Regions:
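Beta-propeller domains
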Residues: 274-281
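Short, flexible loop/turn motifs enriched in small residues
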Residues: 287
Length: 350
């Protein structure tokens, strides 16, 4: 058998395998396979990246369900917020030992006080009128080298447990995406997916670790040159300087990060004021050296309160690693005085 014939058979086998995979993919993911997403098997996009996949406005004539409520978060009534809280409390977490226990303000505060309005979709049972599905989009700034974009971060995607398996989540996502595109002209949205990875090319992949805070012993400082400072409304200038520094470094290609996604300064200070997030600065000789970001996720595990560390950033790149770790332990000590947190959730992302 000559080499040309062998190559033809190899090409034929690869082609058949690829076609069969496409059929499997469309059957396995009937909703996602129709969405403008970068997939691993998108060979053309792998070789010649096109950037934004869908630049033109989507066709809304057949894909918009007007019975799905779509509005700005600031326009929600008190009853709508209460209904949303009830849905999330009963259905947001997947396991029985997990409980999501927010108040009305804990939910809405993450969606307001932003330059670009956050929007929300509500899916109601057509017979009973109960709220059985929801999703929100809130805008964050994505900064990469020579790229600065507003991206819609998708959150609170939740469907009542008794109504799952009916593609309600898919309908909410599609409706929300189309309406958002026509409202803001934004074409980039960010999803956070937990668990088994789907065949989409992710922006990043990271692990999340759980720790018992009782295992962290109290740190006793023996010198005064190094300490931890909680960011409040009186010293938010340090946070502003950090955001400015991060943006300048990545735009000048001198950053340790390839990509930064952050909330605008105005919204961060609002969350600090409402005590939804706690940001600590490691101070040495009156100068910031590192920052530690914690979020109250209003979630308990076996009735134990948890706190989430979602970012740890060096302000000075040459800071000693031992000092960076010491600052983290000092921040943990401070958090224990704020509330009775028992579990630390650490996102290994920065």
């Amino acid at each position: 058998m000559d080499m040309i014939l062998i190559l033809k058979y190899i090409f034929l086998i690869i082609t058949v395998f690829y076609v069969l995979f496409i059929f499997y993919f469309k059957l396995r993911y009937p909703f996602w396979s129709k969405q403008p997403i970068f997939y691993y098997h998108d060979i053309g996009n792998l070789i010649y990246p096109k950037g934004i996949i869908e630049t033109s406005l989507p066709n809304c004539s057949e894909r918009v369900d007007k019975s799905i409520i779509f509005k700005e978060a600031s326009e929600l009534s008190l009853n709508e917020i209460k209904d949303m809280k009830l849905l999330l409390t009963n259905n947001y977490m997947t396991d029985s030992f997990e409980k999501y226990t927010p108040t009305n303000n804990d939910i809405i505060d993450h969606l307001i006080c932003r330059t670009i309005p956050s929007r929300i979709s509500f899916y109601y049972d057509k017979k009973k009128g109960d709220l059985i599905g929801t999703m929100t989009s809130a805008y964050k700034q994505m900064i990469m080298s020579k790229i600065n974009l507003n991206v819609g971060y998708i959150d609170y995607l939740c469907v009542d447990k008794n109504n799952r398996g009916k593609n309600i989540a898919g309908q909410i996502i599609q409706n929300h995406y189309i309406r958002e595109r026509y409202q803001t002209k934004n074409s980039i949205f960010l999803f956070k997916h937990e668990g088994f990875s789907r065949p989409f090319v992710p922006l990043t992949i990271y692990n999340t670790y759980f720790y018992k805070l009782d295992n962290f012993e109290k740190i006793i400082l023996t010198q005064q040159s190094l300490n931890i400072s909680l960011i409040t409304k009186n010293n938010t200038a340090m946070l502003y300087d950090l955001q400015t520094k991060l943006q300048n470094e990545i735009e000048n290609s001198t950053s340790m990060f390839d990509c930064i996604i952050m909330d605008e300064f105005q919204h961060l200070t609002y969350l600090i004021e409402k005590k939804h997030i706690f940001i600590f600065a490691l101070i040495e000789n009156m100068k910031p050296k590192a920052f530690y970001f914690f979020r109250n996720n209003y979630t308990t595990y076996n009735d134990a309160k948890s706190i989430e560390c979602y970012s740890c950033i060096k302000y000075e790149n040459d800071i000693d690693t031992n000092k960076l770790i010491l600052g983290f332990y000092l921040a943990i000590d401070y958090l224990k005085t704020i509330d009775k947190y028992k579990i630390l959730i650490l996102e290994n992302i920065t």
